[in-house]
Amino acid sequence: MPEGPEVKLFVDELNHNFRYYQIKSINVLSGRYIKNPIQNLSLLLNKEIESFNCKGKFIWIDLDDLIIFNTLGMTGNWSRTKTKHSRIEIEFYENDKLYFNDIRSFGTFQIKTRSDLEKKLKSIGPDMLSNPPNNFVNLLRKYNHKNICCVLMNQNIVSGIGNYIKAESLWYSRINPYSFIKDLKVENLITLDKA
């Protein structure tokens, strides 16, 4: 599953290649959105992509008054290449195309408003890459009664951490994944913050 670092790389690449492109057409090619159509898809036509952004694993595409919410799920990605797993095709007036590919169809694509975005961003914890918590130890101590893995994987507490980052960080910090936060030394949590 793409985690914070991979999502950030996708977003950086999308901004580099497609920022300020204008949407000519958008088509659902396959997957779940054939049976359950995306609401208000036609509203995206002729919109200019102002920016691609992310917080943790959550991606949003800013189209001024509209926002596209996107998650990659287990196997999603954005590419110029159409594959048999391409779910959505976006064609631009700039003679280019962008495909949302998703082998397992766990990714999401929704059209929302700016107020929806504000609510969504408030519900997501601080981004592990660009906005780590100022006081990581105190943040974790709020969840003393919980298992360290459950807290790290909860995107509402700290966003962008998935299985491999959790495993590598805990190993580096010498923290048993079955530990409860209350049983951990401050030194372990400080090392975890740096991991």
Language-model regions, residue ranges each:
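Generic alpha-helical secondary structure signal
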Residues: 5, 39-42, 115, 134, ...
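A broadly conserved sequence feature marking short terminus-proximal activation segments
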Residues: 171-195
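Surface-exposed binding/hinge segments that line
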Residues: 1-111
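Phosphate/anion-contacting hairpin/loop surfaces
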Residues: 64-172, 180
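Hydrophobic (often cysteine-bearing) scaffold residues that line and stabilize catalytic clefts
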Residues: 3-6, 161, 192
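Flexible domain-boundary/linker segments
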Residues: 24, 31, 40, 153, ...
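Short amphipathic alpha-helical patches
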Residues: 34-38, 163-164, 179-181, 192-194
